[in-house]
Amino acid sequence: MFGKIVFLLLVALCAGVQSRYLIVSEPVYYIEHYEEPELLASSRVRRDAHGALTLNSDGTSGAVVKVPFAGNDKNIVSAIGSVDLTDRQKLGAATAGVALDNINGHGLSLTDTHIPGFGDKMTAAGKVNVFHNDNHDITAKAFATRNMPDIANVPNFNTVGGGIDYMFKDKIGASASAAHTDFINRNDYSLDGKLNLFKTPDTSIDFNAGFKKFDTPFMKSSWEPNFGFSLSKYF
């Protein structure tokens, strides 16, 4: 039943991508994509509190925590929170919410993000682990976001997206994602890879690299490279 619910969510959202925050830069609105830390991308549920730190090539950084507080032998409910810093080490976004993770790798989450100078956004997201064995893991993800700007004459608007993640032996991974915002008729795309550099039962260090681009009726970007490192820790 849980898997069917998540599957219906994926269909309704047209398959999703992970997107942290929306920034407004006059006169162009744009969506900034990011890679979730490993603790949120893991396809196998754990019952430990855990956190992650990320450092990116553009100078931005972030921290995220996930603390289980309820559940049974199949499903775990956790409180989640994160803080993102700009390349000038100022607050870029702060997020809080709840997540439901299933032992088979499926999941749901509901979060609220506050972006200084912009406003808030509410995001509902889901993931379905479509294949898993000792060597391969494939997960499809979806999200829908209601953006609520605190800016004069800018209405609330929606962003939806989708993506798929692949991992080989918990060592090498790849992902592809896309997002669409009707209000500005903008599409965002990203292709990413991950390499695990160090791993113990409670600690993981990963290298992430990829390319991203966007297009609107008025302008398009080229594929822009990005890379970073993440440290995940279970407690």
From Swiss-Prot:
Signal keyword on record: yes
Intracellular or extracellular location(s): Secreted
PTM: Attacin F appears to be derived by proteolytic digestion of attacin E.
GO cellular component term, pick one: extracellular region
Keyword flag Transport: no
Pfam families for the chain: Attacin_C, Attacin_N
Propeptide: 20-47
Highest taxon of the lineage: Eukaryota
Chain ranges passing through the membrane: none
Disulfide bonds: none
Alphabetical UniProt keywords: Antibiotic, Antimicrobial, Cleavage on pair of basic residues, Immunity, Innate immunity, Repeat, Secreted, Signal
Record GO biological process: defense response to bacterium; innate immune response
Secretion signal span: 1-19
Coarse class of the protein's main subcellular location: secreted
Job of this protein: Hemolymph antibacterial protein.
Extra facts: There are six forms of attacin that are divided into two groups: acidic (E and F) and basic (A, B, C, and D).
Similarity comment text for this entry: Belongs to the attacin/sarcotoxin-2 family.
Protein name: Attacin-E
Source species: Hyalophora cecropia (Cecropia moth)
